[in-house]
A protein has these predicted regions:
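Carbohydrate-recognition beta-sandwich/jelly-roll modules
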Residues: 1-189, 196-211, 220
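A short secondary-structure junction motif
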Residues: 54-58, 146-149, 153, 222-233, ...
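Well-ordered alpha-helical segments within folded domains of soluble proteins
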Residues: 107-128, 178-199, 240-262, 297-317, ...
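Alpha-helical solenoid scaffolds that mediate protein-protein interactions
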Residues: 126, 139-147, 197, 215, ...
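Active-site lining segments of carbohydrate-active enzymes
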Residues: 165-181, 192-263, 267, 327
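Non-catalytic carbohydrate-binding regions of carbohydrate-active enzymes
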Residues: 224-225, 264, 276-299, 318-319, ...
Length: 327
């Protein structure tokens, strides 16, 4: 076989970001030649079809389960830090019980990997477009159940199923991704998507003030608890106490602030979002540091770049300040 190596030399456009030059050059060396297989309309149709499969009953009412996986992936994800030998892995992969896709994990999650709120919003758009009031009311019911769980201080468990066995003592023993305590990734997604859901329904003649209140409670909490040293932190207790403050995952709160600002026009949300974005860029992103979007580990993580890219573009659109394009 043949191995080809490429050496790339450049003067970086920005300190610590020579990769930006490299990505531009790669488009010339390795042009993308594949055309889309499906039209956008067909992709949407298939996506909605998949989302409908994720609706499962929970205590007699529909909820969006996080996704379809295999027992093998559940075994890996459920045992953080556990080691599995290659032979053990191969044996399990041959076992249909462990290698068949299905609903092997009961997870009803606000955002992050589960994206329950985003799934609801997309299906709402489809239901409205097709005048499907029955489906729309069912989806509104899902969000009503979530809104009922939120506390006055804005805190909510990121996994709905954890309300069945919630015990504060489990927080110290569980991985952060297991939904026993509020964290800034899911809270940011929650504020953002619920504000969008509120606006979508309002624009179609349906008023759900409790949905907007869901978002403003989260935004009010983080405006009050922003820190110039740790930003929005990572993990919080249901009582509103900071449990873990490391990493860049607090950036997801910026998206929540901006999307809620678009609906409320509360200047505090916009000002706090801009202040926080500057903080995370100066402390983390400008140094090519972007950690803990995965919430359950301190990792260099592409997922955490999402809120900084999106919120920079949003703030440029809102303020027209060129620095956000540089960001």
């Amino acid at each position: 076989f043949t191995v080809i190596y490429y050496v790339f030399a450049c003067r970086p456009k920005w300190e610590n970001f020579a990769c930006a030059n490299l990505l531009d050059r790669m488009q010339e060396v390795f042009p993308y030649r594949k055309a889309p297989r499906f039209t956008p309309e067909r992709v949407w149709e298939l996506g909605v079809s998949y989302l409908k499969r994720l609706l499962v009953p929970w205590h007699g009412k529909p909820m969006f389960i996080a996704g379809i996986d295999t027992k093998l992936s559940h075994l890996q994800a459920g045992h953080m830090g556990a080691k599995m030998s290659p032979d053990e892995m191969r044996a399990l992969m041959k076992d249909p019980e462990y290698n068949t896709f299905g609903f092997n994990r009961v997870i009803f999650e606000i955002g992050w990997a589960g994206q329950g709120f985003l799934s609801v919003r997309l299906m709402m758009k489809d239901a409205i477009a097709h005048h499907d009031d029955e489906t729309l009311q069912m989806l509104i019911g899902i969000q009503e159940r979530w809104a009922e769980k939120q506390q006055e201080n804005g805190m909510i468990l990121p996994h709905f199923e954890r309300y069945d066995d919630y015990d504060p003592a489990k927080i110290a023993k569980a991985a952060l991704c297991q939904g026993y305590a509020p964290e800034t990734c899911n809270l940011g997604w929650g504020a953002s998507e619920m504000a969008k859901i509120y606006a979508l329904l309002r624009d179609n003649g349906i008023e759900k003030p409790e949905f907007l209140r869901f978002s403003t409670r989260i935004c009010d909490f983080f405006c009050a608890h922003y820190s110039p040293e740790t930003g929005f932190g990572k993990l919080w207790s249901m009582e509103g106490e900071a449990l873990e403050t490391t990493g860049s995952v607090g950036g997801f709160i910026i998206n929540g602030l901006l999307d809620t600002w678009r609906v409320t026009r509360r200047e505090e949300y916009l000002a706090t979002a801009a202040k926080a974005l500057d903080f995370y860029f100066e402390r983390d992103v400008n140094h090519f540091v972007c950690t803990a979007g995965a919430i359950d580990c301190v990792a260099v993580d592409k997922e955490t770049s999402f809120p900084f890219v999106i919120s920079s573009l949003d703030l440029f659109e809102i303020t027209k300040e060129e620095k956000y394009l540089v960001y």
